[in-house]
Amino acid sequence: KVGILTRGYGTPSEHSIVVSADIDPDEYCDKLGDEPAVILRQVPEVIVVKGKDRIHAAQVAVNEHACEVLILDDGYQFLHLARNENILLIDSQNPFGNGKLIPRGFLREPLREIHRATHCVVTRVTDDLDRAEIINAVRSYAPDVQIEWTQHTPTRLLHPLTGVEQSLDIFSGQEVVAACAIGNPEAFTRTLEDLGMTVIETHAFPDHDTISTEVFKSKHPVIITEKDAVRIKHPPDNLFVLEVELETLETTTPG
């Protein structure tokens, strides 16, 4: 039985403990957060425990819900909870920023802390990516770590008002509007363009925010992410949701 521990960014009462098994599915997004809501849509049998106190959340998951495996969301830096595996994600499009820590740069920790990783997953890999920089950096601190190269692959385009699945190429060669409240809106726009769509506008909102209904007044199809879709209670007819999955392209083993 798997439990996921999350801070629940963008939700009220972040300090209190909220468990997915104790609330209605319609409340997942409001009480747990958008990302946990997406996970529970895809894997409804998992237990999500939201709370700022990660140790307390872990105790609730194990003692009250019999969880045998715990996944700590966004927990690489949280050193107060022992773990068996440490999965490090690296964004291939900006792997190490300017080498500086927040707020002078993008890094949360110095590069030397790569040594704590037991697995490394490189995301948003493109065909023209020069992998040498990433391999050399990882190997210099964690020589025995396996590196997985991945990309977000579109799987389907859903019309949420009717629940009808559309072909991924239905808007190929047509003008569309992109809207999202994610950390990297440029990547979402590129994905739509790779599917042949002509993106005439991109409305980017702060991460974990709700897309303004003003966007839906467009005469063009509006494409959003699955993460954004869980926040929209009454989808309009021109709204479509692009769903993606993480695909492993290749694995680089030590040696």
Walk through the language-model features, giving the residues of each:
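Hydrophobic residues at beta-strand termini and immediately following loops
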Residues: 49, 90, 150, 203, ...
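Short, flexible loop segments at boundaries between secondary-structure elements
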Residues: 153-157, 205-210, 237-255
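Active-site regions of enzymes building and remodeling cell-envelope glycoconjugates
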Residues: 20-22, 45-46, 84-87, 196-200, ...
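A conserved segment at the C-terminal end of the G1
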Residues: 1-5
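Phosphate/Mg2+-binding loops and adjacent switch elements
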Residues: 9-11, 16-141
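C-terminal accessory "lid"/substrate-recognition subdomains
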Residues: 95-221
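Short, polar loop motifs at secondary-structure junctions
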Residues: 7-9, 74-77, 185, 224-231
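Phosphate- and divalent-cation-binding pockets in alpha/beta enzyme and binding domains
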Residues: 56-60, 133, 187-191, 231-232
